[in-house]
């Protein structure tokens, strides 16, 4: 059995090698010759999977080691009788920790307390729900906007996007990209939305680039609108707008979900789905795959205030490590993808053991996702 995998899926060759011959290839553009004789294809978000790619091939299963699926024509796969699996939630923790890293940086720079802010979360799925729980653990007020869940009658208090526009100091987008239909998210943050934001707001997009109208955002910033912006995703990619890059506060190359744990979860989820598809179900214990973290343990004294939380969060992941390289090389062709392809290992907060003086501190840090204990 021939299994084609994206060369940037960690642990893919070792895991899928249990099931057949593995051929690792680049994801963008994916070499068509590699698909000849392939039985399965494992991709990331950089590869568009549709009839044009797979027609005439014998591929009978496609897996994407990503939470999002807008790069895959799932309707055509179903029509063609090709099995499919994504990895929902695989990188949700990493995206949440990216948002916190960015907010802590802005809070320190601009001199505000996060507890005094209201955070509006647009899209309350795997990422948004985890973000809401961690913000709540810190006593931060949240407003949730998720029309599909609201219409289903889910047991949450949901708000309209207009409510968030008026009331939220920080608005962060975590929706899929829907280009049509009743829950269209294409340019959800359009010129009218941006124009209606009160001064001093913070806008974060770590979901899909086209959820925010990048042309309208650039126009607003060029016109002098008082708006702080964090962008991890762009419209389009990989050819992002250099004028927009120059005007946003934090800019990164679509890596919010790129923790080592998140990538490994994506690979293991599609591996387990494919093994089940073959009738040979196998499970993987994630920690057994991961190397020791660069910093394994720290001790803190007293209850962690915002400054201490920032130090702990940035000890594991400081968003500036991705902002600086992107600004340095963005004008060069191919560098956006190169930064993603050669992304250095990044860990999640759970990799850091924090030794505390008291149970209250340990409980707070545990709720935030650290491995905290009293010692």
Swiss-Prot record:
Its main location: cytoplasm. Gene3D superfamilies: 3.30.1370.170, NAD(P)-binding Rossmann-like Domain. It is found in: Cytoplasm. Substrate binds at residues 45, 66, 258. Belongs to the D-isomer specific 2-hydroxyacid dehydrogenase family. PdxB subfamily. It holds the Pfam family 2-Hacid_dh_C. Its EC number is 1.1.1.290. GO terms for molecular function: 4-phosphoerythronate dehydrogenase activity; NAD binding; protein dimerization activity. The keyword Transferase does not apply. NAD(+) binds at residues 146, 175, 232, 257. The gene is pdxB. Pathway: Cofactor biosynthesis; pyridoxine 5'-phosphate biosynthesis; pyridoxine 5'-phosphate from D-erythrose 4-phosphate: step 2/5. Homodimer. This is Erythronate-4-phosphate dehydrogenase. Disulfide bonds: none annotated. One of its GO terms (biological process) is 'de novo' pyridoxal 5'-phosphate biosynthetic process.
């Amino acid at each position: 059995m021939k299994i084609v995998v994206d060369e940037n899926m960690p642990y893919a060759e070792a895991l899928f090698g249990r099931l057949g011959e593995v051929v690792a290839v680049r994801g963008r553009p994916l070499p068509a010759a590699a698909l000849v004789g392939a039985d399965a294809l494992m991709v990331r978000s950089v590869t568009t999977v549709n009839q044009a790619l797979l027609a005439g091939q014998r591929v009978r299963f496609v897996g994407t080691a990503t939470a999002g699926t807008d790069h895959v024509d799932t309707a055509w796969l179903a029509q063609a009788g090709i099995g499919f699996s994504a990895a929902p939630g695989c990188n949700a923790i990493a995206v949440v920790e990216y948002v916190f890293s960015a907010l802590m940086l802005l809070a320190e720079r601009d001199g505000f307390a996060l507890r005094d802010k209201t955070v509006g979360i647009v899209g309350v799925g795997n990422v948004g729900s985890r973000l809401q729980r961690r913000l709540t653990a810190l006593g931060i007020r949240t407003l949730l906007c998720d029309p599909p869940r609201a219409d289903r009658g889910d047991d949450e208090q949901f708000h309209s996007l207009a409510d968030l526009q008026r009331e939220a100091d920080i608005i962060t987008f975590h929706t899929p990209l829907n280009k049509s239909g009743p829950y269209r998210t294409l340019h959800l943050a359009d010129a009218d939305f941006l124009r209606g934001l009160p001064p001093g707001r913070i806008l974060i997009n770590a979901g899909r680039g086209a959820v925010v109208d990048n042309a309208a955002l650039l126009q607003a910033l060029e016109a002098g609108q008082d708006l702080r912006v964090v962008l991890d995703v762009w419209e389009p990619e990989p050819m992002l707008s250099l004028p927009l890059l120059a005007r946003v506060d934090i800019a990164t190359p679509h890596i919010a979900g790129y923790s080592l744990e998140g990538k490994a979860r994506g690979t293991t989820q599609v591996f387990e789905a494919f093994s089940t598809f073959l009738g040979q179900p196998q499970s993987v214990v994630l920690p057994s795959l991961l190397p020791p973290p660069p910093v394994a343990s720290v001790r803190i004294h007293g209850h962690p205030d915002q400054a201490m939380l920032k130090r702990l969060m940035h000890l594991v992941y400081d968003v500036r490590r991705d902002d600086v390289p992107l600004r340095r090389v963005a004008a060069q062709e191919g560098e956006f993808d190169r930064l993603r392809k050669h992304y250095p290992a990044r860990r999640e907060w759970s990799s850091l053991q924090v030794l505390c003086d008291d149970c209250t501190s340990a409980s707070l840090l545990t709720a935030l996702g650290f491995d905290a204990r009293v010692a």
